[in-house]
Regions:
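Short beta-strand/loop motif that positions the catalytic acidic residue
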Residues: 199, 205-207, 211
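Active-site loop/oxyanion-hole signature of alpha/beta-hydrolase fold enzymes
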Residues: 40, 49-85, 251
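Conserved alpha/beta-hydrolase "acid-adjacent" motif
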Residues: 212-218
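Flexible "cap/lid" loop of the alpha/beta hydrolase fold
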Residues: 99, 106-137
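Gly/Ala-rich beta-loop-alpha elbow adjacent to hydrolase catalytic centers
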Residues: 86, 90, 94
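Conserved HGGG/HGGXW glycine-rich cap/lid loop of the alpha/beta-hydrolase fold
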Residues: 6-58
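Conserved alpha/beta-hydrolase catalytic His-Asp/Glu region
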Residues: 119-120, 140-195
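Catalytic active-site module of serine/aspartate enzymes centered on a nucleophile-bearing elbow/loop
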Residues: 229-284
Length: 284
């Protein structure tokens, strides 16, 4: 459903499930479809809000402009405070939101992301070339190259059909070239290295041990910089850790966001097992 923010700006979004609100902020090149492993699990416990990151009109103020759109969306939905999960570029937006509008952020989950700037370890030139699809001659080849670099070998070997489905989704529902480049430029300029320590929301950092786009050293530095933050580093996963190790990610997130007493009262079979293939069946 599109939300009219200004005369020229709208945001496509979905709200699913009931419970405390949980805002999911996707990364570069992904739309709401990228949460196909999370929605079945999270909607059991949370009013889960997903939306498509924009950028067509330019991001003069970088990630701050994307954060402004998030605030407008929450205002439209009447959400006064929400848990927030951001992946990659979405993690940048989540950090900006937690710093600039701490009144809106309850608990914070940052996955496959960093605090920007130089950081402890930069993306290698080869990984950057793969992400941008350099050396390819079609949109499909570029998407495949980027997604291969974003996932670990174990995942691609065990779930080749699912990987191919993600490639198809990426091609069918990806940002415009202008939006993609604006988002990429905003991410390149992002730097909260001197401010991230002021985040006050309880924070969980999740990362894949084989992430080529955001090397794991960045996750360790991020968790160390945010007071009291917890770190979960998952093996056999790359940048798309929330897809590759979805069961573990979902379990960690639900456990972190839900009070212990509430978890005991509403204990149910593992949500994560039901997420396997559910969205693939409905979309395939």
């Amino acid at each position: 459903m599109p939300v009219l923010i200004t005369e020229n700006t709208s945001i496509d979004h979905d709200v699913q499930g009931e419970g405390p609100p949980l805002l999911l902020i996707n990364g570069l090149g992904f739309g709401r479809w990228g949460w196909f492993k999370q929605i079945p699990a999270f909607a059991r416990h949370f009013e889960t809000i997903t939306f498509d990151i924009r950028g067509e009109l330019g991001l003069r103020n970088g990630v701050a402009d994307l954060t402004g759109e998030v605030v407008a969306l929450l205002d439209h939905l009447g959400v006064g405070k929400t848990h927030v999960l951001g992946t990659s570029l979405g993690g940048f937006v989540a950090q900006e939101l937690a710093l600039g509008r701490p009144d809106l952020v309850d608990r914070l989950v940052l996955a496959c992301t960093s605090y920007g700037g130089r950081g402890p370890e930069a993306m290698s030139p080869g990984a950057l070339a793969d992400m941008m699809g350099l050396g390819t001659f079609s949109a499909e080849a570029a998407a495949r190259k980027a997604l291969e670099a974003a996932t670990g070998e174990v995942y691609r070997a065990e779930k080749p059909e699912e990987f191919e489905q993600i490639v198809r989704w990426r091609l069918a529902d990806s940002p415009s070239v202008v939006s993609y480049l604006e988002q990429a430029k905003a991410g390149a300029r992002f730097d909260l290295s001197g401010d991230v320590g002021h985040i006050t929301s309880p924070t969980l950092v999740i990362h894949g041990a084989e992430d080529r786009y955001v090397p794991p050293a960045n996750a360790r530095a991020l968790a160390e910089a945010i007071p009291g933050a917890k770190l979960r580093l998952l093996e056999d996963a790359g940048h798309l850790v929330f897809v590759e190790r979805f069961a573990d990610v979902n379990r960690e997130v639900v456990t972190f966001l839900r009070p212990r007493k509430l978890r005991k009262r509403t204990a149910r079979p593992a949500d994560e097992a039901e997420a396997e293939g559910a969205q693939l069946r409905s979309r395939g």
